[in-house]
Amino acid sequence: MDLLIRLGFLLMCALPTPGERSSRDPKTLLSLSPRQACVPRTKSHRPVCYNDTGDCTDADDSWKQLGEDFAHQCLQAAKKRPKTHKSRPNDRNLEGRLTCQRVRRLLPCDLDIHPSHRLLTLMNNCVCDGAVWNAFRLIERHGFFAVTLYLCCGITLLVVILALLCSITYESTGRGIRRCGS
């Protein structure tokens, strides 16, 4: 029991306090990994175009202008999106209703551009479905240490329950064999 209390205390220490900056703050988003920000990366060190054209974004352009242009494209796509796409319940703004598929399609080929504040907001509000994206969201929300602690506690609890079940089953079958033998 003492171990569980200590683990709970460590978990509470790992969670961010209300005064700390949220990982969803656009300034912090610059340091997020591409998977957490729903931004697809290059495959085999070559840029991948998702805009259905062979024209890749020129690296000489201003990164702010690129970010604003991309944000404008995303907003236009969000306005035209079918109502069947899922949104998170807390997404009330148009930017939050974007899907990853649309973001991937609209993403410029030059993936190393420094995104603007508005572009970061769009990427962060990108809606991704599936267990893998939910795991990344959980890590982003609670931190890697806390999620690792959750998993360790869960696995330990599962092992203890299985050990108890096995010992109970072994005792009951062992007594049954002795009774039959006597």
Curated annotation (Swiss-Prot):
Keywords: Disulfide bond, Early protein, Glycoprotein, Host endoplasmic reticulum, Host membrane, Host-virus interaction, Immunoglobulin domain, Inhibition of host adaptive immune response by virus, Inhibition of host TAP by virus, Membrane, Signal, Transmembrane, Transmembrane helix, Viral immunoevasion. The chain crosses the membrane at residues 144-164. It is a single-pass type I membrane protein. Disulfide bonds join C38-C126. Its main location: host cell. InterPro entries: US6. Residues 1-19 form the signal peptide. GO terms for cellular component: host cell endoplasmic reticulum membrane; membrane. It is found in: Host endoplasmic reticulum membrane. Glycans are attached at N51. The keyword Glycoprotein applies. GO terms for biological process: symbiont-mediated suppression of host antigen processing and presentation. Residues 165-182 are cytoplasmic. Interacts with UL18. The ER-lumenal domain is responsible for TAP inhibition. It is sufficient to inhibit ATP binding to TAP. This is Unique short US6 glycoprotein. It comes from Human cytomegalovirus (strain Merlin). The gene is US6.
